[in-house]
Structure formats: structure tokens, C-alpha cells
């Protein structure tokens, strides 16, 4: 296995921060989960709140303890996962990561793929049996094969702000993962090991400079979690949000996984988890082909299994999550709140 990484090293950006129970079960088989738990925050409960009414409902993951070895969410930043995996790869003589190696193009025949990539010393070529594009939402691999990325872009931007203040000490009974509904100023609030992260929407027309002004951010945070002092803003990010799925996850010997294959809004924490599930599913198929004489038709099965899940579950659920948080109709909003209360009673 050879990994081409365009950057000079693993990037330190926080990115995703939630590992769900099925993902932890999968990673446990690879010896990864214990290393993540050491660096993460176990979060057994999930809250739904309203900006004006407060706590609506609280879900306890312990109810699924008979179905998983990890009945909780683990809050642990994505960059920690990449470092754990890098360390594990060093134990394998047949695996390597080539840093500062930027994918350029790929062509394929019936029995191989030829990849061109650039380094500081120039253009290089490498041959392989299969190419798996896991290079993000702007995937150069996907684009090189003219695979459509169907879906839509939301007409707003998302801001994330990280602060060290203990929000559960500022707001009574605030959960470590809380989705706070409001027609225009909804928020997702997540407690990671070293900070609390606020995520909220802003108008598409607002510039980065305006969105990052201390006065604007402080005002938004104070509305969500009123605090007698000023919040200490450690990190702020701004990004556009898409809901898209690749037209196909397989084109001959070239396959897609993770954000290269599907992207969605972050409400529910399904992006990274879905990508890990892709990787586990696809690796099982490749192991069957290499070690057990399996047919390459298994790669079509990967597409048939994972792509419908992205469309019918992940896309549908994340779209619904956002709609529920920003619902403007008071009657629908009340009905949703009553449903949540009834489920947890």
C-alpha cells in the first residue's frame, strides 16, 4: 500500500471530532480505538435544546449497550486519528506514505493503474493494481475520471469557534454535545478534550473579515451561553457546506471513498464516520480479492452497499437535522419538540 499525501506532513487542523459507536467498534478491531480513547472525551449523552426554551430532550447512549462495545460518542479530533494510523503503518514493511506528493492524473488498463504525481523534484509515475481516491471534497482523483459529484450547496456559510471556557459551568445542565434550535441562530455545541466548539450559520454574503470580528463572535456566543466575561477565542474557521454524492464509487480499477465520494453538513457527525465505514468495507473487498481469490465484482458490491447508504441515510439524515434546527414554523417546531420529549420519557 502506498499513500500519496500532497502536504509535507499530517495536517494539524481539528476538522471532525466525533466517533460514533459503530465506528469505534470497527476501529477497535485494528487496535485504534484504545489509542483514541486515551486522547478523547467519552460522551454518553446527547442533548436537543432550544435557544429560548432550554433543554428539550436528552438521549443516553447506554440504552444501546447490548448492541455495541462502545455505547457512547467519543469526542476526539480527526488529526489525532491520522497520527495513530501513521504510527501503526510504520509496523508494516509493505506500507508507506509519500509526503509532498501531489496527485496529477491517472490512466488505467485491464490490469493496472498508472498514476502521475508531482514532488519538489518533478513529475513521477507509479503503477498499482488499484487507486483509491480519498483526497477530499475537491478530489483530483474524482475529477480526473470525470465522475459527477451531484447535489447542492447551502445558501449560507458555517462558522466554528473554539473556546477554553467550561460551558457546562456557565449554562446549567448543558450537555457535552448539544444541538440548539432557533429559526436563524441555531447552534451545535460540542465539548472536545481541550475546548468547547460552537458551530453556527451566517449569511453567504458576509465576508470572512466580518464573520471573524471579535464583536460579532462574542455577541453570538453570549446569546447561546450568556457569560459574565469575554470568551477566549482560540480558533475560528469559516467554510461553505455541500450535500453531494459521486455518481459512482467505482470506475474500473479506480475507486472513491470518504469525502471524495460524498460530503454532507456536519450536523450529526457523519462525514468522517462514513468515510471510515467506506474504508473498512472496501478493504474487506480487496482482502478477499488478494487473499481468497475473490472476484473483482466485489468492487461493484462496494459501490452498491456504500453509495445507497450515503444517499438514503447520511444525506437524508443530515439534511433533516439541519431543517429541524432551523425550523421557522412554530407549530412544526413544537411538534418536533413534543416528539423528542415523548421518545425520551
Q: Language-model features: where?
A:
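C-terminal helical "tail/cap" subdomain of flavin- and related membrane-associated enzymes
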Residues: 247, 285-345
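Glycine-rich FAD pyrophosphate-binding loop
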Residues: 1-16
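Glycine-rich phosphate/pyrophosphate-binding beta-alpha loops
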Residues: 186, 240-243, 262-273, 308
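Short loop/edge segments at beta-strand edges and connector loops
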Residues: 99-101, 117, 235-237
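FAD-binding beta-loop-beta segment adjacent to the flavin cofactor pocket
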Residues: 239-256, 260-262, 311
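Active-site-adjacent segment of FAD-dependent monooxygenases/related oxidoreductases
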Residues: 12-15, 20-90, 181, 190, ...
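Conserved FAD-binding catalytic core of PHBH/FMO-like flavoproteins
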Residues: 86-87, 110-114, 124, 130, ...
